[in-house]
């Protein structure tokens, strides 16, 4: 009634408009409660290209954010040593961050780099684009191989993301290469599925 009177259109027209917006994902209905505006989803393509979280948010007019939860040098696994062609005594730099869109946590991000990337210790990695920082050091990320599966949030992951334990997450694991086809880092992302719209 209110929309019909405000815009001087028939109820049928209003119902059709609301149905159309619901189909497009802009609105959602709750039985017995009404129609509500849907939360904006971050669009990301599942390709072998490399697109930063920051750029994805900017494309959606969302404000990107990041908070470091861990940065340390650790011993690599045998698989990591082999993938990144590491020397026997070489460490890896482990960087864990929570990623935010418009101030809300939407993704956990784990990156592993060769020890030569230790310059990251002196960079401000909170609310910053990692890819832009790497570019500043003449490291241009170019392509990746990705694997995807569904996992369920541990209590620690759930607490970081503000969701319930056991909540389904999309896990994306990537092997990322630079323009010279050298592996720069291994990346694991745990995404809250209903915060993203994936394009294949």
PLM regions and their residue ranges:
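N-terminal helix-turn-helix
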Residues: 1-37
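All-alpha effector-binding/dimerization core of bacterial HTH-type transcriptional repressors
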Residues: 39-200
């Amino acid at each position: 009634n209110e929309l019909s009177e405000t815009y001087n259109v028939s109820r049928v027209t209003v119902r059709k408009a609301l149905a159309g917006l619901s189909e497009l994902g802009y609105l959602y209905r709750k039985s017995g409660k009404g129609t509500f505006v849907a939360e904006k989803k971050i669009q990301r393509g599942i390709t072998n290209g490399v697109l930063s979280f920051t750029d994805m948010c900017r494309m959606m007019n969302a404000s990107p954010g990041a908070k470091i939860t861990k940065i340390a040098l650790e011993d690599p696994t045998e698989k990591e040593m082999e993938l990144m062609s590491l020397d026997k005594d070489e460490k890896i730099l482990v960087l864990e961050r929570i990623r935010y869109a418009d101030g809300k946590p939407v993704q956990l991000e784990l990156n592993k780099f060769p020890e030569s990337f230790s310059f990251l210790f002196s960079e401000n990695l909170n609310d910053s684009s990692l890819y832009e920082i790497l570019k500043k050091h003449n490291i241009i990320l170019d392509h990746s191989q990705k694997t995807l599966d569904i996992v369920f949030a541990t209590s620690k992951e759930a607490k970081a993301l503000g969701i319930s334990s056991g909540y389904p997450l999309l896990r994306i694991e990537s092997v990322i290469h630079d323009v010279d086809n050298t592996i720069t880092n291994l990346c694991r992302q745990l995404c809250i599925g209903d915060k993203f719209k994936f394009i294949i």
